């Protein structure tokens, strides 16, 4: 029955193309596929956060199994879409997805579960503003979101750089599998790299305003 989870994501994507949903999301023919993918990704992130928080509250094996299948199926599904569409700009996400699958495998096998799941939960929480800002920019590219982008950068860097930095020593000492250990350090440095990218974007947004005013 586990295979049923894998058809969940195509169903979610299909629902996003229904006229009433597209009207609500203010989707146009030019941005429909990207907005649809963003919504599917947001559904995964929110669902994953809820399931993982429930696990920490209950320590239920059923919940952690569902959480594993929920996230594992999403990364396989999205990786498949990236592969068949051959969109080079999305290839880095393939590496990210493979890294996530490595971590999820250890979580599912109860290897350093609490540490890995906690860091995985933080990573999903750090992504939440990204979906909102991406959606707004897709439906209104000219909207000034420099302050929202600043808050996004602060939010993301707090979880993915500051909080993650507090667990570098724990990851180095306590994670059993070397591949998982390397994967976690990759995720940490990827977060730092994305933070730098966000900082550059925020700096450019505020600089552009300053130039126009002068």
PLM regions: where:
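Membrane-helix and juxtamembrane interface regions of eukaryotic multi-pass membrane proteins
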Residues: 1-122, 127-130, 134-214
């Amino acid at each position: 029955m586990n295979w049923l989870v894998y058809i969940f994501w195509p169903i979610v994507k299909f629902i996003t193309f229904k006229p009433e949903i597209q009207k609500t999301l203010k989707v146009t023919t030019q941005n429909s596929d990207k907005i649809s993918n963003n919504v599917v990704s947001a559904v995964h992130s929110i669902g994953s956060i809820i399931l993982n928080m429930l696990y920490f509250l209950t320590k239920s094996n059923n919940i952690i199994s569902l959480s594993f299948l929920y996230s594992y199926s999403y990364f396989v599904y999205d990786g498949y879409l990236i592969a068949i569409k051959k969109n080079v700009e999305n290839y880095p996400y393939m590496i990210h997805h493979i890294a996530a699958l490595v971590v999820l495998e250890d979580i599912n096998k109860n290897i350093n579960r609490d540490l890995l799941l906690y860091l995985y939960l933080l990573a999903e929480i750090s992504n939440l503003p990204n979906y909102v800002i991406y959606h707004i920019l897709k439906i209104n590219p000219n909207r000034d979101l420099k302050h929202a982008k600043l808050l996004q950068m602060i939010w993301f860097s707090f979880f993915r750089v500051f909080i993650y930095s507090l667990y570098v020593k724990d990851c180095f000492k306590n994670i059993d599998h070397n591949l998982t250990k390397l994967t976690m350090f990759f995720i940490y440095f990827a977060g730092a790299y994305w933070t730098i990218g966000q900082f550059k974007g925020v700096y450019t947004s505020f600089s552009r305003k300053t130039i126009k005013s002068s």
